[in-house]
Amino acid sequence: IPYSKLIKVFIFDLMFTGIIEILSKVEAIEKENTNVHFTFSCAFTHELKIDQSVAHNGVCLTVVKINGSQYTVTAIDETLQKTNLGNLKVGDYVNLERCMSANGRFDGHIVQGHVDQTGVVTSIIDNQGSWTYTVKYNHQLGNVTVEKGSITINGTSLTVVDSKDDS
């Protein structure tokens, strides 16, 4: 594959903004060896194509099946270990965002849909018009935040205010 084609595939076609497009309900969960197939329904299912990327709680997953108003994606074991998708149950809702094209309007941050690890929200402060969340994560896996950078939580891109070694 020519380098220019790789750039198109891996950079331009797989960008998300961290702005949630819609909530989607988990309709079915099917385990196959170490993989899990999730079936969802949402208002834009009719616009999806096989092999299209969609962020589910911020995790880039590929559409593998479309059946009427429902579509299916597959999460591999590593994805299930590093995300909260393995905790989903039928009836739960996830945040969805379709990938944007490079020439589309860019209103959020650059989000790739690759997950480093999960964290735990340890405090939420109401600042009268905005919110401050403290999220603890495993510092042994590396500092995943940069002051004034962004972090994506369940698909929602947020600006980092105070970056510490473990939060």
Question: What is each PLM-predicted segment?
Answer:
Residues D13-S167:
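Conserved loop->alpha-helix
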Residues I1-L14:
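Short, Lys/Arg-enriched N-terminal segments with co-localized hydrophobic residues
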